[in-house]
Design a protein with these regions (language model features):
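Short glycine/threonine-rich loop/turn motifs
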Residues: 102, 126-207
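Short, glycine/charged-enriched hinge/interface segments at domain edges or termini
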Residues: 1-129
């Protein structure tokens, strides 16, 4: 498929190599059908995973020394309407970080999370174009979200103020932008109060 190439045949095996960084998608139903034919196999990485250029995506081979032509044609027919593997290249995005909370705003604690976000998104070629610090004032945070999107941010991060304490205003601020909240809370630690919303223009806002 696009953005990948086969290796040379070695010991009866062919591997697929990624030509770019991206998200690997696997059609599990087609993979199961081919692997259920017998006398052949395809082993892949898990779908919906991040891969880098040069990574091995899959390995395939026939098990016996020879195989009937009809069986190979059946395997080809399974993929006649689309591939088993798809690699979706990453597109460089611009993002904004709104650091929220009285503790950071009044310099009681240091903002240590913004550098973490920058470092992680740099792996995907993303660029931070907007960064401001706010106290626990919902209206200011709401305005900051709007200005970040007006500045061209493809993704907005709001860090801090996400718990259930009375002075944590970030969820309300995100809601007041008019964004549609998809999820508030996730079964992960740290990150149990993770929030995902989409603004009216489709921009993701993450808290």
């Amino acid at each position: 498929n696009d953005h990948m190439h086969p290796s040379d045949v070695k010991e009866g095996k062919i591997e697929l190599i990624a030509d770019c960084d991206g998200l690997l998608k696997v059609d599990r139903e087609k993979l199961k059908k081919v692997n259920s034919l017998g006398e052949m196999m395809i082993a892949t990485r898990h779908g919906d995973t991040y891969v880098k250029k040069g990574d091995k995506l899959a390995g395939t081979r026939i098990i016996p020394l020879v195989i009937k032509k009809e069986k190979m044609e059946t395997a080809q027919a399974v993929c006649s309407d689309g591939p088993i593997l798809t690699l979706k290249p990453f597109h460089k995005k611009k993002f904004a970080v709104l650091t929220t909370g009285n503790e950071v705003y009044y310099h009681r604690i240091e903002d240590t999370f913004t550098p973490v976000i920058q470092e992680k998104l740099a792996e995907f070629g993303a660029e931070m174009i907007f960064h401001e610090v706010y106290d626990d004032d919902a209206s200011k945070i709401t305005d900051g979200c709007r200005r970040a999107m007006e500045a061209g941010a493809d993704l907005v991060f709001c860090t801090g103020g996400m718990s259930v304490d009375p002075d944590d205003k970030t969820p309300l601020a995100i809601k007041n932008t008019g964004a549609r909240i998809v999820s508030y809370g996730a079964p992960v630690l740290p990150g149990a109060m993770f929030l995902l919303a989409y603004a009216e223009n489709g921009t993701p806002i993450v808290g």
